[in-house]
């Protein structure tokens, strides 16, 4: 009975990832990348932690996922496409689903994979067939006869034939059905220790560096065939390559594509693909399992050819490829370059997929992250996840460690206590991860590079940063007059940048305390030099906290002055001011106090009501002062008539 595989499950979009590794919720190794329908499809093996009864220090793979992306940044997991316990010829508990490949031919997608057979020894190579690159795939009941080995790769050559490579560089032509070796496939006897085997195909790595060679990947470029493969040069694998004019050789060795992993990770395995006129190298490394090199993860780098057709050696990076949108989370710990004192480590050594952190140990330390697209940012602010052992400052700059400042962040690890406050109330945030926000002093244009620098006397660790567009709480007022909205709420306000007040709790907002405080500030108002802004609120209430946040001013422990000008064509008698505020507030109409909202209160419409008032013909000035400690300050105000109906027959101006 034919079995249909698990890609019938719903595809799962992953987080936008423009850093290495690119798959961040599971291990992935031995990546084969192919371009189908103008999209990159990634067919890796799937490392897992060995279950009980399996060898704990060896590779363990039970199934295959397929992933795809249009930009090498946003990856979709299409789910499991083949599993060891559903292939008729595979030993169901072998956990040997090693490096695969997938090609398109004759209107079908052919997925090639190795595994341990139920009968015999070693590895066989099977084929599963689908109508779509993500499946569902249906496996053939038997493996390809004549192949005993691992790591299949299929080349569709310009001569019209398909060739399959496997193991330590063996190669044979496939029949047009893509499921059998060609009838004229040569056979040779091969010695392995004291044993002699008869093997199909030709050995394309003969007379080339091939110690413990495996994982061949072959492609064609400018009339040359490139046989690329991992082999052990000293103690761990490198990626080497050879060139030929014939798919089956002979090949001439040309050098390295990638040297040994610096941390001693034993294996590397790869594929090379051209996508949108750029060549890419897909490979693996044990980033998410640094103490276990049998659990690997896929990484990507750009690859370049020299004029003579040779390949420039690729250096692995943490940054990888792809452009990050500024409004997406940027794992800045996967930086492009850094000062020599910067280190990187896993943020969580138990759940390693929680990613990494970059440690910038002292003043002057920096990390640089290339290719961030700011075109999506209109009215933005910064969010950063960071920690420090002591109070310090970090800056976000453009292009270099001395570049233009985008944002400034204060990390307050050890807040100072107000005078007279007992030490027992001190809150210590030393070495605790804090998610902080900061306004932008400057917004780059288009695609640019980010640099994080330490400007304070203590070092800091950074996990991620993200830019966000502010909701449209308000906009600069126009020169034309406005009216209250249908419910009578005044939306145009003139606001002075907030002043700091030493208020840690709103419980002190008694009537007497507020009256004294507001009256003191009123006498100072003519001498205040704060900047004024005239804004139209998008909502019935003016969000003072967001106003302060946007312009980089005092957000908590704040005192706000707010006013608006009401222009009446005639006297409007017997109206009441109905107002609300988050925090305490005091209201004046034409210089006379009309309402006090005391205590620690939330903003509710019509929370307080004045006595009856008259809006006189001509110009009326409504002024408000709001004070708040730890809350999100805002206010609302309207006038209502004797029946409680909103008054709307006046204009609101800024003149």
Model segments located where?
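Bacterial Sec-dependent N-terminal signal peptides
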Residues: 1-19
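Accessory carbohydrate-binding/adhesion or oligomerization-edge regions at the termini
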Residues: 316-332, 337, 469-542, 624-655
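Short edge beta-strand/loop segments characteristic of extracellular beta-sandwich folds
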Residues: 383-387, 565, 578
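Solvent-exposed beta-strand/loop surfaces of large extracellular or lumenal domains
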Residues: 407-427, 589-611
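Aromatic-lined ligand-binding clefts that engage carbohydrates, nucleic acids, or primary amines
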Residues: 452, 573-588, 622
């Amino acid at each position: 009975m034919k079995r249909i595989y698990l890609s019938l499950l719903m595809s799962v979009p992953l987080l936008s990832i423009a850093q290495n590794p690119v798959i961040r919720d599971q291990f992935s190794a031995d990546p084969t990348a192919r371009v189908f329908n103008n999209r990159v499809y990634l067919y890796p093996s799937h490392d897992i932690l060995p279950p009980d009864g399996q060898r704990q220090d060896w590779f363990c793979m039970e199934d295959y996922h397929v992933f795809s992306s249009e930009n090498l940044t946003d990856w979709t997991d299409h789910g499991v496409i083949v599993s060891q316990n559903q292939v008729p010829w595979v030993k169901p508990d072998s956990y040997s689903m090693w490096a695969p490949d997938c090609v398109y031919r004759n209107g079908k997608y052919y997925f090639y994979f190795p595994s341990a057979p139920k009968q015999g020894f070693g590895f066989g190579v099977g084929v599963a067939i689908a109508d779509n690159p993500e499946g569902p795939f249906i496996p053939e009941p038997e493996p390809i006869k004549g192949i005993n080995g691992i790591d299949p790769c299929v080349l569709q050559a310009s001569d019209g034939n398909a060739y399959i490579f496997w193991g330590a560089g063996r190669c044979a032509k496939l029949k047009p059905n893509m499921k059998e070796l060609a009838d004229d496939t040569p056979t040779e006897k091969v010695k392995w220790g004291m044993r002699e085997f008869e093997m199909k195909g030709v050995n394309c790595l003969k007379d080339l560096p091939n110690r413990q060679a495996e994982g061949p990947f072959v492609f064609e470029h400018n009339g040359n065939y490139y046989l690329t493969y991992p082999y052990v040069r000293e103690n761990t694998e490198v990626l080497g390559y050879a060139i030929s004019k014939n798919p089956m050789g002979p090949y001439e060795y040309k050098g390295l594509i990638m040297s040994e992993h610096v941390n001693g990770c034993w294996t590397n395995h790869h594929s090379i693909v051209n996508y949108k006129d750029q060549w890419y190298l897909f490979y693996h490394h044990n980033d998410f399992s640094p103490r276990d090199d049998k659990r690997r993860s896929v990484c990507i780098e750009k690859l370049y050819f020299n004029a003579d057709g040779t390949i420039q050696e690729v250096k692995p990076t943490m940054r990888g490829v792809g452009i990050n949108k500024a409004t997406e989370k940027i794992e800045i710990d996967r930086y492009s370059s850094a000062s020599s004192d910067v280190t990187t480590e896993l943020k969580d050594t138990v759940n390693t997929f929680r990613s990494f952190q970059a440690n910038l140990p002292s003043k002057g330390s920096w990390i640089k992250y290339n290719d961030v697209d700011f075109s999506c940012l209109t009215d933005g602010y910064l969010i950063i996840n960071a920690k420090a052992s002591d109070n310090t400052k970090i800056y976000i700059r453009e292009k270099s460690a001395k570049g233009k400042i985008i944002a400034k962040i204060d990390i307050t690890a050890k807040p100072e206590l107000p005078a007279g406050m007992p030490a027992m109330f001190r809150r210590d945030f030393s070495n605790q991860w804090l998610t902080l926000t900061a306004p932008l002093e400057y917004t780059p244009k288009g695609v640019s590079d980010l640099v994080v620098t330490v400007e304070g006397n203590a070092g800091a660790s950074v996990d991620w940063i993200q830019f966000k567009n502010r909701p449209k709480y308000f906009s600069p007022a126009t020169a034309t007059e406005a009216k209250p909205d249908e419910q009578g709420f005044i939306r145009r306000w003139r606001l002075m940048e907030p002043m700091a007040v030493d208020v840690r709790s709103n419980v002190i907002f008694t009537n007497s305390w507020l009256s004294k405080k507001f009256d003191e500030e009123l006498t100072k108002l003519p001498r205040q030099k704060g900047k004024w802004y005239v804004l139209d609120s998008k909502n019935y209430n003016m969000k003072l906290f967001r106003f302060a946040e946007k312009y980089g001013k005092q957000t908590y422990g704040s005192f706000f002055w707010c006013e608006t000008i009401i222009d009446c064509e005639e006297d409007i008698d017997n109206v009441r001011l109905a107002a609300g505020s988050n925090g305490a507030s005091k209201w004046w109409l034409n210089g006379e106090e009309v309402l006090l909202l005391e205590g620690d209160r939330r903003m509710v419409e019509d929370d307080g009501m004045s006595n009856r008032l008259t809006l006189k013909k001509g110009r009326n000035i409504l002024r408000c002062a709001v004070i708040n400690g730890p809350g999100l300050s805002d206010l609302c105000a309207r006038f209502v008539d004797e029946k409680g109906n909103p008054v709307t027959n006046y204009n609101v101006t800024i003149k």
